[in-house]
């Protein structure tokens, strides 16, 4: 496991190479990630870093949160995230330390995790790419219906996990092996090739690619 950072999706643009090729990129803002807690085998049973980033209005911070951040001596952020550590990883990182985008300076590919855009309640055609039924030939009301969802007496039920209508999107999604195009440490920006999950301003978890 490699240490990751929390970023914010700014949007998409494109950059041009020296030979004129256009590369679509997603711009991710990675402000300073502050270490709020260091978990150890002795106290917690596993090794991890608990980090926060961004800011939060004072009247939105609960008393337990305020005490937790005050104990760590860091400014309250918009959330708390945990990064598991492998043996020997993260040595020397203490509570109150700041992690910045420059840790990706020597990383070629990253995995980006975020929450996909929510689509609400959708039918099988949009949610699962089902084909539509006949437009004519006697079909009056079932143009976008799912169709058969099972058998009669045997097994006499609908199998679990059957693809049907339901809530679509708003799920945790990871896009793997995205090329790192540019690291702008001065402006706290990371540019990766292609699209990443979620809407603009959504929180993202960026880690060095596990399959690189």
Curated annotation (Swiss-Prot):
Belongs to the universal ribosomal protein uL3 family. The lineage of its organism: Bacteria, Pseudomonadati, Pseudomonadota, Gammaproteobacteria, Alteromonadales. One of the primary rRNA binding proteins, it binds directly near the 3'-end of the 23S rRNA, where it nucleates assembly of the 50S subunit. The modification N5-methylglutamine is found at residue 153. This is Large ribosomal subunit protein uL3. The gene is rplC. GO terms for cellular component: cytosolic large ribosomal subunit. It holds the Pfam family Ribosomal_L3. PANTHER family: 50S RIBOSOMAL PROTEIN L3, LARGE RIBOSOMAL SUBUNIT PROTEIN UL3C. GO terms for biological process: translation. Keywords: Methylation, Ribonucleoprotein, Ribosomal protein, RNA-binding, rRNA-binding.
């Amino acid at each position: 496991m490699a240490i990751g950072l929390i970023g914010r999706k700014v949007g998409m643009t494109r950059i041009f190479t020296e030979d004129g090729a256009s590369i679509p990129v997603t711009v991710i803002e990675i402000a300073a990630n502050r270490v709020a807690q260091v978990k150890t085998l002795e106290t917690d049973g596993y090794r991890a870093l608990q980090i926060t980033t961004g800011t939060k209005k004072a009247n939105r911070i609960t008393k337990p949160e305020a005490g937790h951040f005050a104990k760590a001596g860091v400014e309250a952020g918009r959330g708390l995230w945990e990064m598991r550590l492998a043996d020997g990883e993260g040595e020397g990182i203490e509570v109150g330390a700041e992690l910045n985008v420059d840790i990706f300076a020597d990383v070629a590919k990253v995995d980006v995790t975020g929450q996909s855009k929510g689509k609400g309640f959708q039918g099988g055609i949009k949610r699962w790419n089902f084909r539509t039924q006949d437009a004519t030939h006697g079909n009056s009301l079932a143009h976008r219906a799912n169709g058969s969802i099972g058998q009669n007496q045997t097994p006499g039920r609908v199998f679990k996990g059957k693809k049907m209508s339901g809530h679509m999107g708003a799920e945790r999604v990871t896009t793997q092996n995205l090329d790192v195009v540019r690291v702008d440490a001065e402006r706290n920006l990371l540019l990766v090739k292609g699209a990443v999950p979620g809407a603009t301003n959504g929180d993202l978890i960026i880690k060095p690619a596990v399959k690189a």
